[in-house]
């Protein structure tokens, strides 16, 4: 499996994580709209944009794994011990999220995403 390289703003390598240095917005439907700012391969800030998570902001440590061309698994744990695992498909522009909240409540959601900046 190819290793992931730190990426500048543009690359043609489909195994390089393209999100670093960019802000993305994912619409999970209903009142769940979230933005993710990827600072590096190990740091990201989450912004809740509407609904019950509006004004939520947290910077988390992330782990990024290349699954295949243009598809990456991104995992993190939030301060309240919520654990999130994304499969981010940059070819199809969709994120699949598996979330385990404190108390073992499990959610599986998905939605389209777009680069904001």
Locate predicted features.
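Tryptophan-anchored aromatic micro-motifs
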Residues: 2-32
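Short beta-strand segments that buttress and anchor functional surface loops
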Residues: 24-28, 46-49, 74-78, 97-100
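Hydrophobic residues embedded in beta-strands of well-ordered beta-sheets
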Residues: 42-45, 71-72, 93-95
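Contiguous, well-ordered beta-strand patches that form the walls/edges
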Residues: 52-88
């Amino acid at each position: 499996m190819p290793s992931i390289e730190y990426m500048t703003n543009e690359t043609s390598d489909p195994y390089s994580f393209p999100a670093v240095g960019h802000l993305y917005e994912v619409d999970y439907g209903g009142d769940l709209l979230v933005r993710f700012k990827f600072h590096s391969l190990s740091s990201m800030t989450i912004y809740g944009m509407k609904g019950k998570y509006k004004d939520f902001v947290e910077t988390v440590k992330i782990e990024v794994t290349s699954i295949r061309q243009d598809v990456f698994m991104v995992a993190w744990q939030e301060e309240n011990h919520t654990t999130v695992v994304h499969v981010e498909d940059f070819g199809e522009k969709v994120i699949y999220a598996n979330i385990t909240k404190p108390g073992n409540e499990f959610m599986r959601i998905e939605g389209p995403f777009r680069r904001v900046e």
